[in-house]
Amino acid sequence: MVNVVLAGGGTAGHTSPLIATAMALQERGATVSCIGTPRGLEGRVIPEAGLQLDMIPPVPLPRTVNADLFKVPARLAGAVRKAGEVLQRRQTDVVVGFGGYVSLPAYLAARRAKIPVVIHEQNAVPGLANKIAARFAVFVGTAFPDTPLPKARFVGMPLRSQITDLADASGQARAERCARARADLGLDINRPTLLVSGGSQGAVAINEAVVAARTRLLADGVQILHVLGPKNIRGATRITDELTGASWLPMGYVDDMASAYAAADLMVARSGAGTVVETATVGLPTIYVPLPHGNGEQARNATSAVDAGAGVVVANADLDVERLLAETARIHDADVLAQMSAAGRGLMPAHAAEEMAVRVISAATSIDPTIG
């Protein structure tokens, strides 16, 4: 029996591929547990997925030079110590990290204990934790080709079975999934449907642009499933156009994004790695609005899908009512949507979770995980 500890959290961009890989490992007989921090989304979604979760202290890195920067070494040392205790208690054979500030203590604790480390990097531009650990990891899998990490191997994004099942559905089966998803969400099954989401935390710029354009979209007969983010849902209630009957349906968070994707004809979203890969894989045409902060990874994430014709990019600064209405007008052109959908399907490997599971078990059993 192989004991695997997976580390990653903060947002759905880290937790979703972690959970997908964990499920694939369990299917192969591995004993799986996870490491997270109290600050991240993992505190809810990992236990809900039926996985065991051990908590360690968070060690966020300040974006500017301030007093908190000088506290990082002591905080990191404490988190590494706690992670080491978890690895020892779990009798860990291999650590799998998905980036984010929870991963670095787990990586360093594993290295100290001489436990092999396997990495998955979700973004086209790698984060700091994975950059550090890639130097001593036995296998580095990436969601995008040409990610600049040592020993990187393009495997795709680990996706949960709900996403891969939707990706595999076509024709009548896909149409039935669409109708069922719309009905379950309280939407009209026959109406053009726009899905809007700024990721697990929401996105103010996208939310404001869509709300400003809402009246005109509804008057045009487009219904909107708007995932505002848990911090932005307060006071938001369903709005229906009296003449067209089209509705704006606000939600704080959607646990089953596969159903939201199935219900939609077109999406407006940030270009987090998970969103880009999932929308391309299921063939959902998407208008990507990259987060303008950070190291530019969101703009890079969208490149492959946009170059293939599966989506378009609108800069955050350019997103206003008129631009949004111009880009979403394609929702009425079935031929354009079909072309974009076809361009996305097959662009990314749909079964990366299974490949990652094979590599992880190989690393734990002293088989070279880079072979094959």
Curated annotation (Swiss-Prot):
Biochemical pathway: Cell wall biogenesis; peptidoglycan biosynthesis
Phosphoprotein found in the keyword field: no
MF GO annotations: UDP-N-acetyl-D-glucosamine:N-acetylmuramoyl-L-alanyl-D-glutamyl-meso-2,6-diaminopimelyl-D-alanyl-D-alanine-diphosphoundecaprenol 4-beta-N-acetylglucosaminlytransferase activity; undecaprenyldiphospho-muramoylpentapeptide beta-N-acetylglucosaminyltransferase activity
Keywords per UniProt: Cell cycle, Cell division, Cell membrane, Cell shape, Cell wall biogenesis/degradation, Glycosyltransferase, Membrane, Peptidoglycan synthesis, Transferase
Binding site for UDP-N-acetyl-alpha-D-glucosamine: T11, A12, G13, N123, R160, S200, Q298
Major location (coarse): membrane
Catalytic activities: di-trans,octa-cis-undecaprenyl diphospho-N-acetyl-alpha-D-muramoyl-L-alanyl-D-glutamyl-meso-2,6-diaminopimeloyl-D-alanyl-D-alanine + UDP-N-acetyl-alpha-D-glucosamine = di-trans,octa-cis-undecaprenyl diphospho-[N-acetyl-alpha-D-glucosaminyl-(1->4)]-N-acetyl-alpha-D-muramoyl-L-alanyl-D-glutamyl-meso-2,6-diaminopimeloyl-D-alanyl-D-alanine + UDP + H(+)
Domain of life assignment: Bacteria
Pfam families: Glyco_tran_28_C, Glyco_transf_28
Name listed for the protein in its UniProt record: UDP-N-acetylglucosamine--N-acetylmuramyl-(pentapeptide) pyrophosphoryl-undecaprenol N-acetylglucosamine transferase
